[in-house]
Regions:
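Glycine-rich phosphate/pyrophosphate-binding loop regions near the starts of catalytic domains
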Residues: 23-36
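C-terminal binding/interaction regions
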Residues: 233
Length: 265
């Protein structure tokens, strides 16, 4: 999902516990998953993150058979009392409980029970890390991007939010239409390079551009993911170049360099 038109950007960080990253245990000892939700800081409204989390938990986690919902950020200074809001699904049969040494809400459901921590913490993260893959054809650009995503998946604290981790419709900020905030990046559309109204910017021979977008817990996580993706994909056949969208520095103050030796320490 993209915050261009969605309520947040969400994705799977990693599986944890049995069968996953066993350095992280779940409160109930079962297999689990860490999920990240992000909204842009320029929205300046944490309540939008709370609403997005409420909708996603209520519709995607509460409904999932045998699932529970735990707060990973126990030390976070900021938090939402989301457990109480989700618990209203219990229609007055819900109740406060303590389990696994945690303060939780208990909701009776047809499958048995759903339990959830009373509070979910939140903190600043990083959005919009990206890589562009310039291919001789669609197959090469897509194959390179797929290799990049595969390398990112095992890295902790990072998510890729688009289908399969890849965007085939990379956008620019702004539009000629006032009802949307982003639009196709015509300078980099292969089929518009000969359009006289477009100032084409694609290198010679490029016929497809695929993009990976990364969000994460912090700068170091995104840097690690970026370098892993580049290393895994750079030798792809018919891949002509790897670059990234800078957007004239308008979308944020954090800069990640594709050449690791140029990244400030």
């Amino acid at each position: 999902s993209s915050s261009i038109l969605c309520d947040c950007e969400a994705g799977l960080d990693r599986y944890v516990g049995p069968g996953g990253d066993e350095s992280v245990s779940t409160p109930d000892g079962r297999p689990g998953a860490i999920i990240q939700l992000h909204i842009p800081k320029f929205w300046k409204d944490p309540k939008k993150l709370e609403k997005a989390a409420l909708v996603r938990i209520s519709q995607n986690i509460l409904t999932c058979p045998t699932a529970s919902c735990f707060n990973l950020m126990d030390d976070a200074e900021s938090y939402f009392k989301l457990g109480k809001k989700v618990a209203f699904f219990g229609n007055k049969y819900q109740k406060r409980i303590e389990r696994f040494g945690r303060k939780m809400w208990w909701i009776p459901i047809l499958g048995g029970e759903f339990i959830m921590d009373r509070r979910l913490g939140y903190a600043d993260g990083l959005m919009g890390g990206n890589l562009w893959y310039f291919g001789k054809n669609t197959e090469s650009a897509l194959k390179a991007a797929e290799k990049g995503v595969e390398a990112i998946l095992p890295i902790p604290n990072v998510i890729t939010t688009f289908p399969g981790g890849i965007a085939g419709s990379g956008s620019k900020a702004g539009s000629d239409y006032d009802f949307t905030i982003a639009s196709t990046y015509e300078k980099f559309c292969p089929l518009l390079q000969k359009d006289p109204s477009v100032e084409g910017a694609l290198p010679e021979g490029v016929n497809s551009v695929m993009e990976i977008i990364m969000n994460g817990k912090d700068m170091d996580s995104i840097i690690t993911a970026t370098q892993a993706a580049i290393e895994a994909s750079k030798e792809t056949e018919d891949l002509l170049m790897i670059s990234a969208g800078n957007y004239n520095g308008k979308l944020g103050k954090s800069f990640i360099y594709l050449h690791p030796d140029k990244q400030p320490s």
